[in-house]
Amino acid sequence: MELAAWCRWGFLLALLSPGAAGTQVCTGTDMKLRLPASPETHLDMLRHLYQGCQVVQGNLELTYLPANASLSFLQDIQEVQGYMLIAHNRVKHVPLQRLRIVRGTQLFEDKYALAVLDNRDPLDNVTTAAPGRTPEGLRELQLRSLTEILKGGVLIRGNPQLCYQDMVLWKDVLRKNNQLAPVDMDTNRSRACPPCAPTCKDNHCWGESPEDCQILTGTICTSGCARCKGRLPTDCCHEQCAAGCTGPKHSDCLACLHFNHSGICELHCPALITYNTDTFESMLNPEGRYTFGASCVTTCPYNYLSTEVGSCTLVCPPNNQEVTAEDGTQRCEKCSKPCAGVCYGLGMEHLRGARAITSDNIQEFAGCKKIFGSLAFLPESFDGNPSSGVAPLKPEHLQVFETLEEITGYLYISAWPESFQDLSVFQNLRVIRGRILHDGAYSLTLQGLGIHSLGLRSLRELGSGLALIHRNTHLCFVNTVPWDQLFRNPHQALLHSGNRPEEACGLEGLVCNSLCARGHCWGPGPTQCVNCSQFLRGQECVEECRVWKGLPREYVRGKHCLPCHPECQPQNSSETCYGSEADQCEACAHYKDSSSCVARCPSGVKPDLSYMPIWKYPDEEGICQPCPINCTHSCVDLDERGCPAEQRASPVTFIIATVVGVLLFLIIVVVIGILIKRRRQKIRKYTMRRLLQETELVEPLTPSGAVPNQAQMRILKETELRKLKVLGSGAFGTVYKGIWIPDGENVKIPVAIKVLRENTSPKANKEILDEAYVMAGVGSPYVSRLLGICLTSTVQLVTQLMPYGCLLDHVREHRGRLGSQDLLNWCVQIAKGMSYLEEVRLVHRDLAARNVLVKSPNHVKITDFGLARLLDIDETEYHADGGKVPIKWMALESILRRRFTHQSDVWSYGVTVWELMTFGAKPYDGIPAREIPDLLEKGERLPQPPICTIDVYMIMVKCWMIDSECRPRFRELVSEFSRMARDPQRFVVIQNEDLGPSSPMDSTFYRSLLEDDDMGELVDAEEYLVPQQGFFSPDPALGTGSTAHRRHRSSSARSGGGELTLGLEPSEEEPPRSPLAPSEGAGSDVFDGDLAVGVTKGLQSLSPHDLSPLQRYSEDPTLPLPPETDGYVAPLACSPQPEYVNQPEVRPQSPLTPEGPPPPIRPAGATLERPKTLSPGKNGVVKDVFAFGGAVENPEYLAPRAGTASQPHPSPAFSPAFDNLYYWDQNSSEQGPPPSTFEGTPTAENPEYLGLDVPV
C-alpha cells in the first residue's frame, strides 16, 4: 500500500466555539480519494473520530460509505477548519445540518473547500434494474446551516441522484474577499427533483423540506456589511463575525472570522507578555492566551508544544528544543547555546521525501533515543530497489532501534522479516506521540505481518491517533494489551480485524504468563508482562526476590528486586543489604574502609588527582587502618603489611645534592657580578657623552625643525565692538553683524562677532580658543582669517564680514547667471587655499561648497575650521575618535578607519567641484549615509555633471580614487584648473552663456545687510590690517574710510567652529567697475601669485583705493606661475573673452612694485604649533560638540527668525532634538548634553551624516 507521511493534528479536547462550554475538538483525515487502509473498520474509524465532535481541526472526509451506514455521529459538527469531501458514497443523506462554516485552511486539489464527487449507485445506469427499486446515492446536501466558506470554491460532479445544488445561492455562502472561489458543478440527474418549499424566499434551498431553506447572510446586507442577520441597516454583524450573527456585538457571532476568545470574536488572542508603561517593564499578562487553530486557549492541549510567542504547535521553531515539565506539559524553549543534534525521522528535514526505512538511511538512527518524525517499513524496505541501487534491508540492521524510546510521529509496519516472530527490536520504545498521523488518523499501524506477538513490552503511551492492527494471520496477544491505558483522549481506539483468533492462540499455549497482572501482556513469557503480579527483576516477572537465598542477594523496593553491592557479605538469617551502594551492606565480604565495603585496602591510591596517595593496611578484624608512613613517590619497598618501608637516605645522594647546590650558587654569583659591572660601564659612558655634548653646544637645538609660529592675535576691547544685527544663533551663542571701531582711530570696520552664551562650560571656551588659534595662524587670500578676540565673560570671536554668504547658496541663487569662467576661477582659488593649508600642515576635514564664503563674485575664501586639525612636524595623518563628520564628502579611508590626511581633503575637493558644476546639487541625494561606504567600495561615484567635459570630470574621478596616493596633489589641481581657466568654454559648456548676463553682483543676503543705515562709511578689514597707503597716491587720506564703500552687502555662512566671515562690495551708487578690475581682496582667480605683478592696461585706469587690496600678499602661498603667465590666467586667443580675464591683445606694460612691506610669508614646511595651554580632546580632536548645552552646533547656517533683528539676544524656541543640517554625531548616546536654557533657531537633522565613533 502506498504510504504518505501526512502531518496532522492529534485528538484534542478544548474550549473553542462561541458561547459553548466543553466544545469537543477532533482531528480530521487526509486520505483524499484513496481507498481506506481497512475497509472493514473504516466506518468505525469515522465513528471514533467524530462521535460528539463539534469542531474538526483538519479535513472532514466522508468516502466509500455503504448505503446502510449510520452517520448520526456527524450531526454535532459545526465547523471544519480544512475542506469537506463527500465522495464515492452510497448513502442517501449526510446529517450535517448543524455545519455553519468551512474555513478552507486546506483545499481539495488546492482549489475547493467543498467537494461532492461520484456519490452514486453502481446500478444507477443499468437499464435492467428491478422495477420499483430506488437507486442508491446522495440525494440531498441538507447543509441548511452552512452560511460561510472563507476560502476555496465548490466542486459538485457525478451525483445523478443529487438535487438542489443549483438552487443554492453560492454567492452568499462564499466570502466576498475569497480569492479562490470557483463554483464547478453539474446538474445531470437521473431523477426529477421537487421544487423548493414555498416558504423559501427567492427559491433558494438545500433540500425539499421547509427546514432546508437557505439562510442568506451576505447578499441581503446593506452596503458595508460583510454578514448580517436581516435586511435592515441595524442588522449588520460585527466585523469579526463569520457565518452570521444574532446581534451587533462581537459576542453575538455564530462563528468567528479570526479567533474565538471565550465566546468573543477577536482579531488576535491576548498576548502572554504586556508592557507596563509606568514601570517600563515587561510583565506576564494574566489574561494572556495561546493561539490554537482559530481559538484562544489558556493552555495548549495535550501533545501540543507551547511557544514563547503564544502559539500551540507540533514542531518547535529553529534554535528551540522540546522541554517536558514535571507536570507533563510540553513547550519549546530557546537553546542557550547551539541546540544539540537530534534524530530526524520520515517526513522531517532531509528525510521529508523518504517513503520508508531502507538500507540507505537506517544507520542515521543508530544510538537514537528519540526520533523527531515517523518510521515506516514497506515491502520495498526489505526487497530493495535495483533501479535506484538501494540494497535490501537486512534483519540485523534493525538492531539500531533497540535504544529507541520515543517517536514523535507514527509507526507504520506493513512488511517485516520472516525470521522475526515479534517487534522486540522496539522493546525499549515507551512513547508514540502521534503528532504526525498516517492518513491523518493512525499513530500505530501493523498490517499483513507474519509475527506471532507484538513484543512492545515498554510501550506506555499512544499520545494521539488510532491504532490499526489487521490482516496479521499469525498474530496473537492483540486483546491482551490494555489499550485504554495507552490512549490519552476519548477519541482514540484500537481497530483490529483479520488477526489470529484468540481460541486458536490458546490452543497453542500462546497466552500471557501466570505472573502477568490481570492477564495483560505483549507476548508469551514472564518478560512480556505489562505489569507483574508479584515482583519484577529487571524486565522479568518473578515470584520472589533473592533476599534470603540465591545469588546475588537482593533487596526489595516496591515491587522491584534490586541487587546488593558485590562487596556485601551474603546473610542467611537476615537481609544482606538495604541498598545498592557499598556503604549499605550489613556485613562486608572482604574489608571495610570507613563505612564502605572494599575488595582491598587502598595502597598508594589517590582518591583525587589533586590529593596525596593514601596507604592503608587491614587489621585483624578486616578494617583498613592508615600506615605509619605515608609515602608520596618512589614507594618501591613495602613491608609485610603492604605499607611503605622506612626510606634511609644514601650518602651518594647527599654528596650529589651538595655539589649541585654549590655549583648553582657559584654560577648565580658570577652572573650577578657581570651584570653589575656592565651597568656601571654604561652609566660611565652615558655620563661622558653628556658632558662632551654640553661643552660642544654653541646654539639651541631644534629637533623638530619646525619654525616658530609668529602669528599675532589681536585682543579687542568690548567697547571697540558694536553689535548691529543678529545673523544667527545656536546652542553655543549668537553671531552678530557688527562694527569694529579701534580706539583712537576714526575708522569703522564691518565684522562678524561670535558671542558665547552665558554660563558657558570651560570646555566650550577652550574649544573656541582652539579654533581661534587655527584661524589666526593662516595667511592666504583664499583662506578666511581671524581679526581678533574679545576676552569678556563670554568669549567673542571677531572675523571678517563676507557679503555674499556661502558659495553653495551663491551658485544656487545665481545658477542661470554664472559662466564657465566663474566656476573655473572658483575651483582654482579653492585649490590654492587648500594647497596653502597643506603647506602649513593643516588638515581641513570639512571642505564643501557650504564652507567656502564669497567675498565678491570674483573672490572666494575657505572657512569653517571647526573640524580642522594641525599635524605635528612628524605626523602625516590624523586619526579621529568620533564627532560630527560629513559622510558624503569624506574619503573612504576617513569613513572606515577615521584616517584624515591632505589626500582625504582632495577627495572632499572633488565633491566640492561637483557641487559647483551641478549648481549646488546634493551629492548622493536620496541615498542613506550608512550605505555610502558599500557604494564607494563597489566602485560607484558621483555622475558627470551635464556642463562638464570629460577633462573636468576625469579630474574629479582622480580625486575619488580608493588609493589616496593615486589622487592628485593640490598643487597639481591648481595647475590643471588654471590651465582650464585660460580657455573656460572649452572645458565647461553652459548653454547660451554668451547671451546671458554678466556675473551676479547681488544676492538676497547682500540686500538684507543694506537695511542697516549704520553700515556706511566703512573700511575693509584687510585694508585696515595691511594698509597700502601711498602706493598709488601719496595722499594718506585715500586709505581712510572716507572713500570706502558707502553701501555694503553681507551674508551669513556656516563656519566650522562658529566662524562667520563677511566682506564688502561697492554699492549700486558707485560707477560700475571694469570687468578686469579686481573686487576687494585678491579679486578673481585670474590673478595668480602676487596680485600686484603684471598690471594690464585696464588696471591702470583703476583708482588707487580699488587696487590696494591687490598688493596685500607679496607671494602666492601655493604654487607660483611660470614667468610667461605674467601673473594672469588669461584665455587663449581662440576663446571668447569672458569676464575677469585680460583681453588677449592687451599686454602688461610694466610690473608694479609694492612700496609697502608685504606681510610675512610662512616658509614651506612651516607648521602651526598648538598652544601648550590648550588641551584638545583625544588625538587633538575637540569632539564634544554638545558642550554648549544644546544640539545646534553651528548657528551660522541658520537664518535668523523674523522679528529678532532688533533684539541683541534673541530667544526663539529651540528644540535640543535638532542638529545641524549637514552633520550627525552619534556620540550623543555616550554623553548627554548638559541642561540648557538657551533657545536657538531650530534646524532639521540630516540622517545622511553619521558619527565616526560607530562602525559604518
UniProtKB/Swiss-Prot annotation:
Q: In which tissues is it expressed?
A: Expressed predominantly in uterine epithelial cells. In the muscle, expression localizes to the synaptic sites of muscle fibers.
The record's section on Pfam families has: Furin-like, GF_recep_IV, PK_Tyr_Ser-Thr, Recep_L_domain, TM_ErbB1
Q: Where are the annotated segments for Interaction with PIK3C2B?
A: 1196-1198
Q: Where is this motif: Nuclear localization signal?
A: 677-690
User: Which segments sit on the Extracellular face?
Assistant: 23-653
Keywords attached to this Swiss-Prot or TrEMBL record, sorted alphabetically, are: Activator, ATP-binding, Cell membrane, Cell projection, Cytoplasm, Disulfide bond, Endosome, Glycoprotein, Kinase, Membrane, Nucleotide-binding, Nucleus, Phosphoprotein, Receptor, Signal, Transcription, Transcription regulation, Transferase, Transmembrane, Transmembrane helix, Tyrosine-protein kinase
Key word DNA repair present:
no
What are the disulfide bonds?
C26-C53, C163-C193, C196-C205, C200-C213, C221-C228, C225-C236, C237-C245, C241-C253, C256-C265, C269-C296, C300-C312, C316-C332, C335-C339, C343-C368, C476-C505, C512-C521, C516-C529, C532-C541, C545-C561, C564-C577, C568-C585, C588-C597, C601-C624, C627-C635, C631-C643
Name of the molecule in the record: Receptor tyrosine-protein kinase erbB-2
Q: Which residues form the signal peptide?
A: 1-22
Modified positions (Phosphotyrosine) in chain numbering: Y878, Y1113, Y1140, Y1197, Y1249
Q: What does this protein do?
A: Protein tyrosine kinase that is part of several cell surface receptor complexes, but that apparently needs a coreceptor for ligand binding. Essential component of a neuregulin-receptor complex, although neuregulins do not interact with it alone. GP30 is a potential ligand for this receptor. Regulates outgrowth and stabilization of peripheral microtubules (MTs). Upon ERBB2 activation, the MEMO1-RHOA-DIAPH1 signaling pathway elicits the phosphorylation and thus the inhibition of GSK3B at cell membrane.
